[in-house]
From Swiss-Prot:
It holds the Pfam family Ldh_1_N. It comes from Burkholderia cenocepacia (strain ATCC BAA-245 / DSM 16553 / LMG 16656 / NCTC 13227 / J2315 / CF5610) (Burkholderia cepacia (strain J2315)). GO terms for biological process: malate metabolic process; tricarboxylic acid cycle. The keyword NAD applies. Its EC number is 1.1.1.37. The gene is mdh. The active site is at residue 188. This is Malate dehydrogenase.
Length: 328
């Protein structure tokens, strides 16, 4: 008996990340190889022709799991009964644009999208914000959707998590799949803090295997933090395929579970680890039965506290920068 189709909304559907994302969703990489999907694609009126071109390509792949496609410029159509919403589209920073202008331009987009989700999405909708500044955009959407559970709103730190895994595998000489218990704390920005104090590879402590504080402080943390800029420098374009891959990882693990393994998600704080409530902050989680659960009770040393407070300060500044644009 075939499962009923799940509705997956994707914003910024004509963009580069979506182009790497949509074919993988239609192939079953997001929700499982036995789960039919209906794609509900949102983009601006001027991008509708480009979205239609992408849909022609989706048609031409003849994906068995793709049960339907909706193309629209109306968030209320895109988010209707959505089970998953991937908020990829955001206003990019243009030359000479101040950060506060970027925040307010995105606040406008994400208040509208949050309100539309609030009105028409499934009450269990799983929302992942990919568009930057992702944590604060997720916070804005959450605050604009008072009738949906706060826990439904998440921001993507999985790209930072995966970048950190890859650096640790290269440094330790261990297979990337063998590394467990990595955490990335804070904002999806160069201030975030990749933390491998608890990490193991094939059961051995990575901290003991690598045993290099200077590498951690002066190479590892900045390399992960500035990786996006390094890719733009090398390629001339932003990291779209790796971002799409991280979005797939994030939602797949949230829906299908992590089997006890830690992953990083930006989630609304409950006050743990000294993070004020409701701030969307990257923390280690495990996922089971469609729910995430933060890893509790980790010891925070002085260096980690300083790093965690630094990225929190940036998030608080962003929150305060959009406070006047939010109703509640």
């Amino acid at each position: 008996m075939a499962k009923p189709a799940k509705r997956v909304a994707v914003t910024g559907a004509a963009g580069q990340i979506a182009y790497s994302l949509l074919f993988r969703i239609a192939n079953g990489d997001l929700l499982g190889k036995d789960q039919p999907v209906i794609l509900q694609l949102l983009d601006l009126p001027q991008a509708q022709a480009a979205v239609k071109g992408v849909v022609m390509e989706l048609d031409d792949c003849a994906f068995p799991l793709l049960a339907g496609v909706v193309i629209t410029d109306d968030p209320k159509v895109a988010f209707k009964d959505a089970d998953v919403a991937l908020l990829v589209g955001a206003r990019p920073r243009s030359k000479g644009m101040e950060r506060k202008d970027l925040l307010s331009a995105n606040a406008e987009i994400f208040t509208v999208q949050g309100a539309a989700l609030n009105e028409v999405a499934s009450r269990d909708v799983k929302v992942l914000v990919v568009g930057n500044p992702a944590n604060t955009n997720a916070y804005i959407a959450m605050k604009s959707a008072p009738d949906l559970p706060k826990k439904n709103f998440t921001a993507m730190l999985r790209l930072d998590h995966n970048r950190a895994l890859s650096q640790l595998a290269a440094k330790s000489g261990k297979p990337v799949a063998s590394i467990e218990k990595l955490a990335v704390w804070g904002n999806h920005s160069p201030t975030m803090y990749p933390d491998f104090r608890f990490a193991t590879a094939e059961g051995e402590s990575l901290l003991k295997l690598i045993n290099d504080d200077v590498w951690n402080r002066d190479t590892f943390i900045p390399t992960v933090g500035k990786r996006g800029a390094a890719i733009i420098e090398a390629r001339g374009l932003s990291s779209a395929a790796s971002a799409a891959n991280a979005a797939i990882d994030h939602v797949r693990d949230w829906v299908l579970g992590t089997n006890g393994k830690w992953v990083t998600m930006g989630i609304p704080s409950d006050g743990s680890y000294g993070i004020p409530e409701d701030i969307i902050y990257g923390v280690p989680v495990t996922c089971e039965n469609g729910e995430y659960k933060r890893v509790e009770g980790l010891e925070i040393d002085a260096f980690s506290r300083e790093k965690m407070d630094g990225t929190l300060a940036e998030l608080l500044e962003e929150r305060d920068g959009v406070a006047h644009l939010l109703k509640n």
